[in-house]
A protein has these predicted regions:
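Non-heme Fe(II) oxygenase metal-center motifs and adjacent flexible, charged/small-residue loops
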Residues: 1-155, 164-221
Length: 221
């Protein structure tokens, strides 16, 4: 089902998740990490939360083909051009997943205080049952999923819960060079987050490749 990759399915009710913890070799991942640190126009995205504009707790860059504008939290982002370092990765994903991703959100987590809150990648421009390909570079961080509607998630707001599955919730550790693929009803049934952590951690870059099918549509999250 996934040529040219070692993706293995993860058992989570109603979700379609696959993970290859070593999709890129260490040499490939090291080179890409260094190239993206220097070659991406990192910026602090301003988003709307609780009725006011706030700085996102991370650095980001929206990258894509012409016309792939992206709007979330009532803020519209125009795509930066694809950096040369990402073109081979885009092609490799196309071959592995048979999807021509036309955009990618790059997030840079500088330390354990940088994080991503609970959300689903369910923007209308992604269409029903979107495929999200997430490549992680740099320090390993814990990635959490919980069913939509679940209000509490033990201690993962601090990134301290051990990897594993409990009561329909899941925590994964995403290492350097890993590939996580979310598809099917994953976004409709689950929210995910990258919690902050008090543990000392080095920098991490995450690349979430997407295919926008309704260019310029409004996103809600």
């Amino acid at each position: 089902m996934f040529p040219f990759s070692g993706l293995e399915r993860i058992d989570l009710d109603g979700a379609d998740l696959s993970l290859d913890p070593a999709w890129l070799s260490c040499t490939e991942a090291d080179a890409l990490f260094d190239a993206l640190l220097a070659g991406i126009a990192w910026e602090t995205h301003r988003i709307r939360m609780f009725g006011r504009q706030v700085d996102s707790p991370r650095l980001s860059c929206w990258i894509g083909d012409p016309g792939t504008s992206y709007t979330y939290s009532r803020t519209r982002f125009e795509p930066h051009p694809w950096p040369a370092a990402l073109m081979p990765l885009r092609e490799r994903l196309r071959e592995a997943l048979n999807i021509d991703f036309n955009s990618v959100l790059a997030n840079r987590y500088r330390h354990g205080r940088d994080a991503m809150g609970w959300h689903s990648d369910d923007e209308p421009e992604l269409g029903p049952q979107p495929v999200i390909a997430s490549v992680s570079l740099g320090a390993a961080r814990r990635f959490a999923l919980k069913p939509r509607g679940m209000k509490s998630f033990d201690r993962t707001s601090h990134g301290t819960q051990s990897p594993g599955k409990k009561d329909g919730r899941l925590v994964l550790e995403l290492p350097h060079g890993s590939l996580l693929v979310m598809r099917g009803d994953t976004q409709a049934r689950y929210r995910h987050a990258l919690p902050a952590t008090a543990r000392p951690v080095d920098e991490r870059i995450n690349l979430t490749f997407r295919r926008i099918v309704g260019v310029g549509a409004m996103a809600n999250s």
